Amino acid sequence: MIGTLGPERKMNLTVACSGENHIEPRHALHAGLITAELLTNAVKYAHPTGLPVSVQVRYETNDDGSFLVEVTDDGVGFPENFDPTTDGGLGFQLMRALTRGLNAELQFEHDCLGVCARLVKPGTFGGANIESTPAVKGN
């Protein structure tokens, strides 16, 4: 996937997983597509000058069926006045639609270095154990 962006784009990727619970295949598919789009955006836009981008992916599952996927980069962040709930191209539209399909929330923090995106899927067996910050619903 990242290789299709050209050899001039470099990424240092760190992945951390916690929890021993499995998620439904449909949920895994949606979460995987959202993660792929977030990684692609990080490589394409985090460092417009072409510097390597550092990206951390964190995946967490809980007994109640809830899960969290967090993708954080060290880039320049969103452009001024960019609203991830309404702006963006086809990739952001896709992420919002997939988030709706999961009945999940896609949260963005971008007030510091880079962008932090969190996909939070509440549990299907009761209340979610994953802490959630104010969210951007998949509009």
Language-model features: where?
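Structural preference for long, well-ordered alpha-helical segments in enzyme cores
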Residues: M1, A31-A42, Y59, L94
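Glycine-rich G1-box
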Residues: V76-G77
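Flexible, glycine-/charge-rich segments associated with ATP-binding catalytic modules
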Residues: T4, E8, L13, L33, ...
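Conserved short strand/loop->alpha-helix "switch" segment adjacent to the catalytic nucleotide/phosphoryl-transfer site
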Residues: G6-E37, V43-L51
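Short beta-strand/loop element within the Bergerat-fold HATPase_c
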Residues: P52-G65
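Active-site-proximal flexible loops/turns
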Residues: P48, E80-N81
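Acidic ATP/Mg2+-coordinating residue in the GHKL
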Residues: D73
